[in-house]
Regions:
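Conserved active-site tyrosine of GNAT-family acetyltransferases
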Residues: 138-139, 143
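Active-site beta-strand termini and strand-to-loop segments that position acidic
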Residues: 70-72, 163-166
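Short active-site oxyanion
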Residues: 122-126
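Acetyl-CoA-dependent GNAT
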Residues: 3-6, 14-17, 25-100, 111-113, ...
Length: 166
């Protein structure tokens, strides 16, 4: 289980089109600052480059039911989590935390709130393709590993994990 040493208080709201640019910056920052811990420089560049594809990133955020964690008072974005319905499964598309907020339970709490909202809407099955960073967070809320694959992203190979719950 992922433990929160210093839990971060946050406000929770649905993302809008006006948030896409700021979310892309948070995504890019996470990829560039955290990526080198587990990825090669080529993988880090590929991962971060997605934030620069404005139409694709906009779709990534707005196609899913994406929620934003903001610091109370000043509204600074701390992270975001998005889930979309794909058949009878709710697919978690995104879970990103600002690099200065990691290892404090924020990712786990954002994912938990996202799943609770979907549960309240009748969802019973969840799945996600996750990275080495997010896999422990998903496992902390009951997801189990079902598959490991090597898959290309922006022309670079990455190891990805399929996790499912329910």
């Amino acid at each position: 289980m992922v433990a929160a040493a210093n839990p971060i208080a946050f406000d929770w709201r649905r993302a809008t089109a006006d948030d896409v640019f700021t979310l892309a910056a948070l995504y890019r920052d996470a990829a560039l600052r955290l990526g080198p811990l587990v990825y090669t420089p080529e993988q880090v560049r590929a991962w971060a480059s997605f934030a620069d594809d404005e139409p694709a990133f906009r779709h990534y955020v707005l196609h899913a039911d994406t929620w934003i964690a903001e610091r109370p008072g000043d509204g600074r974005m701390l992270g975001f989590c998005g889930v979309a319905t794909e058949g009878d499964v709710r697919e978690v598309h995104s879970l990103y935390v600002a690099p200065n907020c990691t290892r404090r339970g924020l990712g786990t709490e954002m994912l938990r709130r996202t799943l609770e909202r979907a549960d309240a809407e009748g969802a019973t099955r969840f799945a996600a393709w996750v990275t080495p960073f997010s896999r422990p967070v998903f496992q902390a809320v009951g997801f189990a590993l079902t598959q490991t694959v090597e898959a290309p992203f922006a022309g670079v190979m990455f190891e990805r994990y399929r996790v499912e719950r329910g």
